[in-house]
A protein has these predicted regions:
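Short, basic, low-complexity termini and linkers enriched in Ser/Thr/Gly/Pro
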Residues: 65-89, 254-259
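Divalent metal-binding pocket/active-site signature
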Residues: 97, 104-199
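Active-site-adjacent C-terminal substructures of enzyme catalytic domains
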Residues: 171-297
């Protein structure tokens, strides 16, 4: 059984904002050591040139993995989640683009200055030469031109995940009908639920067919919020992600491990703003199982559900 993290920017001092392919392989190695079989490295929004440079590095790292004839991907059973370290690196299976077609008003920790309109010309310039490697693109469905772009992405066999968004319920539903398949890190960096406008959050929880990413560490979502998700949402459509970043697992004796960010109460910047997830998906799954969640359901959230989503 494969464990799959579809949303990781980095880990252990490395991230996808690099021109060094060894950094991407280090990310795969650290995830593998935590029992993850496959990862989809996630690219930060930046200029199109920089994003393409980052994608090229991931592509080269994938090619190096494939060229290593001794390489075997990790696989674990339900009973071995976070109990037996896996030494083989996780297999890099593609690229997730988190942007740049996002709403700057819901950018979260991302750089709002790098977010651009979802035009066809911007899209084609971004993906040229990487069409076969890109698995997921996060798009804010309320942006002008987003519906057309989502249809184009779906026609190419790439998944659109809706996120970093101020979309209403109707705008989210329109994005779903245009071909979007998921919602990026539900509750985080999106319009809040209102009793007169449930928004993207309400659609994500209520629609039985749309997939939702969940950052199940102790910092992004209150335990009762996670309980709400598992009570309301079709369990076949919940995908636990790490949303891990360079600072995740980069421990240091001081609370400030690298200038500008802190560990302890999650991975945050100096203002206390969350930068990304602090746990691997296997750690997050074990945490939920230890809290009393059904082991089979939780395990599917890091195995069968993401695998089905990516088909």
């Amino acid at each position: 059984m494969k464990t799959i993290d579809i949303h990781t920017h980095g880990i252990g001092g490395y991230d996808t904002r690099t021109t060094v392919e060894d950094h991407i392989l280090k990310i795969a190695g650290i995830h593998g050591a935590h029992g993850i079989s496959e990862i989809i490295p996630t690219i930060y929004p930046a200029t199109l040139r920089v994003m393409r440079e980052n994608m090229l590095v991931v592509k080269k790292a994938m090619e190096r993995q494939k060229a290593d004839l001794s390489y075997q991907p990790s696989a674990i059973s339900h009973e071995k989640i976070e109990k037996t370290p896996i030494l083989e690196p996780a297999t890099i299976t593609g690229i997730h683009l988190e942007g740049p077609f996002l709403n700057p008003n819901k950018c979260g920790s991302l750089n709002a200055m790098t977010l651009i309109a979802p035009t066809e010309s911007n899209f084609l310039e971004l993906i040229e030469g990487f069409e076969d490697l890109i698995r997921i693109i996060t798009v804010a469905p309320e942006l002008d031109g987003a519906d057309k772009l989502i249809r184009r992405i779906a026609d190419m066999g790439i998944i659109t995940s809706m996120g970093h968004s101020d979309a209403t319920y109707a705008e989210t539903e329109a994005g779903f009908k245009s071909g979007a398949k998921g919602i990026t890190h539900i509750f985080n960096a999106m319009r809040e639920f209102h009793h007169r406008e449930p928004g993207i959050l309400g659609f994500g929880l209520m629609n039985d067919d749309v997939y939702i990413e969940v950052i199940a560490d102790p910092y992004h979502l209150d335990p009762k919020t996670i309980e709400l998700i598992f009570r309301l949402k079709n369990p076949e459509r919940i995908i636990i992600i790490s949303d891990s970043v360079r600072e995740s697992k980069a421990f240091a004796p001081s609370p400030v491990a690298v200038p500008g960010w802190r560990t302890g109460a999650g991975v945050t910047d100096m203002r206390g703003r969350l930068l990304g997830g602090s746990m691997t998906i296997t750690e997050a799954a074990k945490r939920l199982i230890d809290a009393g969640y059904d082991e089979e359901i939780v395990t599917r959230c890091i195995t069968e559900n993401p695998e089905r989503y990516l088909l």
